[in-house]
Amino acid sequence: MEKKEQLYEGKAKKVFTTDDPDLLIVSYKDDATAFNGLKKGTIAGKGIINNQMSNHLMMLLEKQGVPTHFVKELNERETLVKKVRIIPLEVIVRNIAAGSFSKHYGVEEGVVFDKPTIEFSYKNDALGDPLLNFHHALALKVATYRELQTIERYAMRINGILQEFWATCGVTLVDFKMEFGRLADGSIVLADEISPDTCRLWDSDTHEKLDKDRFRRDLGGVEDAYAEIMRRLEEHL
């Protein structure tokens, strides 16, 4: 597979075309951002960990019947993926109150929800990624009603699979965000990544944060937290 021109560069990844029009190469960077790009930094080795962790979890989901864009890992930083048209939604599943949910609704961090809650936000940094409901998404023509139903169904399924897996690692999946895309035939698949950049992961016993919140909140030990969560994942695959 030949890597060709750079198609896109985002906050944490670069995307390249290949000699196959239906496949792309994603290259993970060590760059870190928070608060819609207002805070910037570098986390040494993050790109390697995020690439490998995301690939392991995508394969886990595929085995459980959840379609993803993953094709194969090329090297420690690069992965071959199916070309998709990204739907401009961030889909957030929350099992425990934290982050913006606690801030917006005045709920103390750590409160466990009776059932997982799903939020949609419009992917637009200039607008601050505002929250959307189904009606907003339909009005903006972000997706069809059937697509939104499919995304919601996949999101709940993914949450259940990941919660169960992380529990075996002594880790609590607090919340996480996902992106979905359309393949050429219109079918919906999970895209982007699943990593400590996109998930809140707490040690199940101590509630120590093992994710990008350590960078957001200047808690220190960011590289160690990423390495620890990767170590636990590899031990339980």
Show where each model-derived region lies:
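Active-site loop/lid in soluble adenylation, ligation, and acyl-transfer enzymes
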Residues: 2-121, 233
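Short coil-to-beta-strand
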Residues: 24-28, 124-135
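Short histidine-centered catalytic/ligand-binding loop motif
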Residues: 38-48, 131-154
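A short glycine-rich, hydrophobically flanked beta-strand micro-motif that places a catalytic Asp/Glu
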Residues: 72-77, 166-182
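Conserved metal-phosphate-binding beta-hairpin within the catalytic cores
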Residues: 93, 173-192
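Phosphate-binding core of ATP-grasp and ATP-grasp-like enzymes
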Residues: 111-128, 159-170, 195-200
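A long amphipathic alpha-helix within ATP-dependent nucleotide-binding catalytic cores
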Residues: 142-174
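C-terminal helix-cap and adjacent tail motif
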Residues: 194-237
